[in-house]
Amino acid sequence: MAARVLLARGGLLRPAAQSAFLPGLRTVTSSSHRAREDSWLKSLFVRKVDPRKDAHSNLLAKKETSSLYKLQFHNVKPECLDAYNKICQEVLPKIHEGKQYPCTLVGTWNTWYGEQDQAVHLWRYEGGYPALTEVMNKLKENQEFVNFRKARSDMLLSRKNQLLLEFSFWNEPVPRPGPNIYELRSYQLRPGTMIEWGNYWARAIRFRQDSNEAIGGFFSQIGQLYMVDHLWAYRDLQTREDIRNAAWHKHGWEELVYYTVPLIQEMESRIMIPLKTSPLQ
């Protein structure tokens, strides 16, 4: 969401130039611009982080559910992608449907734009960490899954995962019919800014729900910390462009973007295509 107000140089985030240099960028009065510029610079160099009274998981996550999410990234050998997809579509739905496993396959995709030959899987564990441990222990005794993992390991270049909680102000991801493309926008936040990010996005999310594009919003608990992942669905790339542009015509969106930009260290966008067995189509 920060693309309109950022220019990247040497990996450092900075505010975009005045509209005289970028035609079409919204203009503000010089006094207002100077005030915002001063505020923005102060947020970079003299930011004061207020002490927290509780953990992020207690302040930002949903209280009515103890669900835990696992996000997996598998980088596949290019010549093995079709075979990898085939065995995933054979085995993963059985875990999803198995009553003995307290977990749900939220979605499974191949990255279309972004890192190539990559598979992305999102799981939900109803019951938190105990459910995750239960599933792991039961799968160790599942010979079909053991064989699947062995075959899969020969197809992979690398893999990583994260354990996530869901922001309280996002809806829980639910299956949806297709066809859709999906965008996973990942933000590496500056340490100490997660609460502020949550506060801003609790207001910003209302600007991004008119077309039912918001799937889920998550923050990391284990893995790469201070990571935020937002998952969106669109009919196609042009629809994505139209929906994102429309947000800029809504009063309040630009200001929320402006104040979330300084919280970001890095950001990445993946456009993903669901596999045939993905609950999110």
From Swiss-Prot:
Listed GO MF terms: protein-macromolecule adaptor activity
GO CC, one annotated term: mitochondrial matrix
Keywords, comma-separated and alphabetical: Autophagy, Cytoplasm, Mitochondrion, Transit peptide
Disulphide bridges, residue numbers: none
Span of chain positions assigned to the transit peptide in the UniProt entry: 1-27
An annotated GO BP: mitophagy
Similarity section: Belongs to the NipSnap family.
Described purpose of this protein according to its UniProt entry: Protein involved in mitophagy by facilitating recruitment of the autophagy machinery required for clearance of damaged mitochondria. Accumulates on the mitochondria surface in response to mitochondrial depolarization and acts as a 'eat me' signal by recruiting proteins involved in selective autophagy, such as autophagy receptors (CALCOCO2/NDP52, NBR1, SQSTM1/p62, TAX1BP1 and WDFY3/ALFY) and ATG8 family proteins (MAP1LC3A, MAP1LC3B, MAP1LC3C, GABARAP, GABARAPL1 and GABARAPL2). May act as a positive regulator of L-type calcium channels.
Record-given protein name: Protein NipSnap homolog 2
Source species of the chain: Mus musculus (Mouse)
